Amino acid sequence: MTVSAALQQSADEAGLLPSHQARLDYRTGKGWSTAGVANGFVQGNLAIIPERYAGAFHRFCQLNPKPCPIIGMSDPGNPHIPALGADLDIRTDVPRYRVWRDGEMVEEPTDLLAHWRDDLVTFVLGCSFSFEEALMADGLPIRHIEQGCRVPMYRTNIACTPSGQFAGPMVVSMRPFKPAQAIRAVQITTRFPAVHGAPVHLGLPEQIGIADINTPDYGDPVPVGTDEIPVFWACGVTPQAVIAAAKLPFAITHAPGLMLITDLRNKDLAVL
């Protein structure tokens, strides 16, 4: 039985949404990738920073909506965002987190109970996992889901618009498709601007500063067939790279590929 099928069975038995059941599973230490988990529900990237930096970071997200589309934001010190889900706790409901100090990643805990502070503001940013459901519904193959690994992600030479101390390159995720499939993928994902929208680049990875497509900066490599082209979407790991470059004294993000699963429905994010 697949992880997704087992999750659905557990949710049905408990009378819960699959998204809620997934959060409960992660809360108890089950740390698998969230790709393909709780299909139909919106997944989000996390950026958790001290309140004193939150204004500049919020502005950064507004200036860079492709990689940083905000779908939720907490009050300072509040680990709950009710609009995103019932019984949702930012401190425990993600499979793995990253703790940053002065720009260095110092720990990858499975919960934040020992790290939580009253001044922390959580930003939840849209994730491309959400539009993957629409791609698969149209019959398009998603390579990293087929292979049971994390989506490959790369730093690029595409500069984000800076805000205060927040600046740096865009990070992109990659999915390979045959040319006709790539055209269809553009058409489908254009409908989902709240989760990165249309791709930012197709083919020739060197044009956006990617030297070796087989060596991603985050996630896992996937094969690209000789009859396929790589298609790149803006990625919510961008703020992770930007926060690290800003060398904040303290910050928290999710571990790449291990997202927050919300109770929002993917179909409700479509604009057409």
From Swiss-Prot:
Q: Which InterPro entries match?
A: D-Glu_cyclase (IPR009906), Putative_hydro-lyase (IPR038021), UPF0317 (IPR016938)
Protein name, please?
Putative hydro-lyase BRADO2538
Q: Which UniProt keywords apply?
A: Lyase
Q: What is its EC number?
A: 4.2.1.-
Per the record, the similarity remark reads: Belongs to the D-glutamate cyclase family.
Extract one GO molecular function annotation from the record.
Answer: lyase activity
Q: Which Pfam families match?
A: D-Glu_cyclase
Which enzyme class, named as a word? Answer: lyase
Work out whether the entry's keyword set contains Lyase.
Answer: yes
